[in-house]
Design a protein with these regions (language model features):
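Substrate-binding clefts and catalytic carboxylate motifs of secreted carbohydrate-active enzymes
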Residues: 10-247
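Catalytic cores of extracellular degradative/oxidative enzymes
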Residues: 1
Length: 250
């Protein structure tokens, strides 16, 4: 590890808590070197949630974690966005890009895949399923370290019957089985994180994950189902008038 503590050791010695930005790989090293130090993750990646929880359980001197970002926001356009060529041909964050694209919650307040993952990593839920947009399963997207996944809790992909699908399952269980319309399509064990990936084929109907302990006892089940033909979407604006280019219309 680079000895960057030559710049911080004197300052941190006079502080109650040391704030670390994207420094989770230093936690163990620095706590061993400075036994009286208290560490707070003052800015971290969404993908570090599981590792943070494991470190915090191991050492009570790690007292908290602030992720960038909790909710998407205006500005820093595209810094945390995963967009595809059909929507953003240049991946340059230029004209047409509005928000950062980063966050466990989107601009409308909807929890995203990162939030789902975090709840499992923090032991608030036992199991969750998220699906990468099936119409873009194998497509390249804009790069960003501030987004962990664009998978969502949906098994409704109209026009994608028979296409390749990538399913993410989040669990702390010993192993998990994935079923599509009652047929088991695979069994996997989480390794150094609480997520596993299944490459499968999309079929309308039902997808179910079943989590097991080491003795093959069922811990939890989670199911997603395809929306029926009667399902419709309706948009109702909160305001009847907004300013062009400056206001958001909810």
């Amino acid at each position: 590890l680079y000895p960057c503590d030559v710049k911080t050791r004197d300052a941190y010695a006079n502080m109650d808590v040391a704030g670390y930005n994207y420094g989770i790989k230093r936690y163990r090293h620095d706590l061993k070197k400075y036994p009286k130090r208290m560490i707070l993750g003052s800015e971290t990646f969404c993908a570090d949630a599981y590792q943070f929880m494991q470190e915090a359980k191991r050492d009570k001197r790690i007292i908290g974690d602030f992720v960038w970002a909790a909710q998407d926001y205006l500005g820093e356009v595209g810094i945390g966005a995963w967009e595809y060529k059909d929507y953003a041909p240049r991946f340059d964050g230029g004209c047409g890009w509005v928000s950062a694209g980063s966050g466990r919650i989107d601009l409308t307040g909807k929890p995203l895949g990162e939030m789902t993952y975090t709840r499992v990593a923090f032991e608030l839920e036992d199991l969750a399923i998220a699906v990468v947009p099936v119409d873009h399963t194998k497509d390249a997207h804009s790069p960003s370290a501030w987004k962990m996944t664009n998978a969502m809790e949906s098994w409704s992909w109209d026009g994608c019957e028979g296409k390749a699908a990538k399913v993410e399952v989040y669990t702390r269980a010993d192993h998990v089985k994935l079923y599509i319309n009652g047929e088991c399509v695979g069994t996997k064990k989480p390794k150094n994180d609480c997520k596993v990936f299944f490459d499968t084929t999309y079929h309308n109907g039902e997808i179910k994950a079943v989590a097991f302990d080491a003795n093959d006892n069922v811990i939890a089940e989670k199911t997603l189902a395809t929306a029926g033909k009667e399902t419709v979407l309706r948009a109702e604006p909160e305001l009847t008038r907004v300013n062009a280019d400056t206001d958001l219309c909810y």
